Design a protein with these regions (language model features):
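N-terminal domain-start motif of subtilase-like serine proteases
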Residues: 1-4, 30-43, 135, 162-165, ...
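Acidic-leg catalytic submotif of subtilisin-like serine proteases
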Residues: 1-33, 48, 52
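Extracellular S/T/G-rich loop segment that most often corresponds to the catalytic His/Ser-adjacent loop
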Residues: 6, 24-25, 141-219, 223
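Solvent-exposed loop/turn segments at secondary-structure junctions
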Residues: 8-11, 28, 58-59, 77-80, ...
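Subtilisin-like peptidase catalytic core
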Residues: 33-109, 152-156, 237-240
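Substrate-binding/access-modulating region of protease and related hydrolase catalytic domains
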Residues: 76-148, 175-176, 191-207, 246, ...
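C-terminal subdomain of the subtilisin-like protease fold in secreted/lumenal serine endopeptidases
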Residues: 100-102, 219-263
Length: 263
């Protein structure tokens, strides 16, 4: 079960039918709205990221990274990113028993507001996979810049880091650079509310690739912990010929390599 905190998700889209196990919507005070609505998405961002994680095959080769995964999807971005909504969604996801949380959102700079819940996710054996941001080198967003998060930047199909992908160095020991790794985040085609498809770009699109890959590895190696899954992902990474560690850190992960590392 993968936690998905975004603008919601269109549960009627063919690629997401049967994929959304839980859905919730939160108000500006971080309270769950009841009765809960059927899964929907007034924006499109969340439907795109949800289908990247767990989209079922509809036609051709369009399919999510982990098409057998189920989602606990929370609408926490509605007319802007509100801290209380995100905190409410994170707490709700913990209560649903997720093993991975994918958050393609963030607040510019370093905000400590989400640190306690991110640490709680870790303490519960949940892998927090968060976007680093889209403001370029020398910048990052919270909670994607926490040491406790698996921070994701973007890369192109030819394994280059696009200018928009954020990266930043912090004074905190060995793991001082964010993002931790990069994933495809340019021209990504995924679901659009209403049954269609659209291409989008950003670290928002890269993050669900990594969350989906983590879910696949957890399915293949169910006895492995979130920390072990993360370690395998990190050790599977390789820098592309034009990637640098200050922008891509470890580089691009490989599912087959990570699975071999898990034994």
């Amino acid at each position: 079960l993968v936690g998905h905190l975004d603008t919601g998700a269109d549960g009627r889209h063919p690629a997401l039918r049967g994929a959304i196990r839980h859905f919730a919507e939160f108000d500006d005070l971080g309270r769950e709205r009841r009765p809960g609505p059927r899964a929907y998405d007034p924006d499109g961002h969340g439907t795109h990221t949800a289908a990247t994680i767990a989209g079922r095959k509809v036609r051709g080769t369009l399919v999510g990274v982990a098409p057998g995964a189920r989602l606990a999807s929370a609408m926490v971005i509605e007319g802007g990113e509100v801290v209380a909504r995100v905190l409410g969604g994170m707490d709700w996801a913990i209560g649903r028993g997720v093993r991975v949380v994918s958050m393609s959102l963030g607040f510019p700079g370093y905000w400590p507001d989400f640190l306690a819940l991110t640490r709680l996710l870790r303490g519960r054996g949940v892998l927090p996979v968060f976007a680093v941001g889209n403001e370029g080198a020398g910048t990052s967003r919270s909670p994607g810049n926490y040491a406790e998060a698996l921070s994701v930047g973007a890369c192109t199909r030819d394994r280059k880091v696009p200018r928009f992908s954020s990266s930043q160095r912090f004074r905190r020991g060995a793991d001082a650079v964010v993002p931790d790794l990069v994933a495809p985040g340019v021209g990504i085609v995924s679901a659009r509310p209403g049954g269609g498809w659209q291409a989008m770009g950003g670290t928002s699109m890269a993050t669900p690739h990594v969350a989906g890959l983590a879910a696949l590895l957890m399915e293949a190696a169910p006895k492995k912990t979130a920390d072990e899954i993360e370690r395998a992902l990190f050790e599977s990474c390789r820098l592309g010929p034009e990637m640098t560690a200050d922008r891509a850190h470890r580089g691009l992960p490989s599912g087959p390599r990570a699975l071999r590392l898990l034994g």
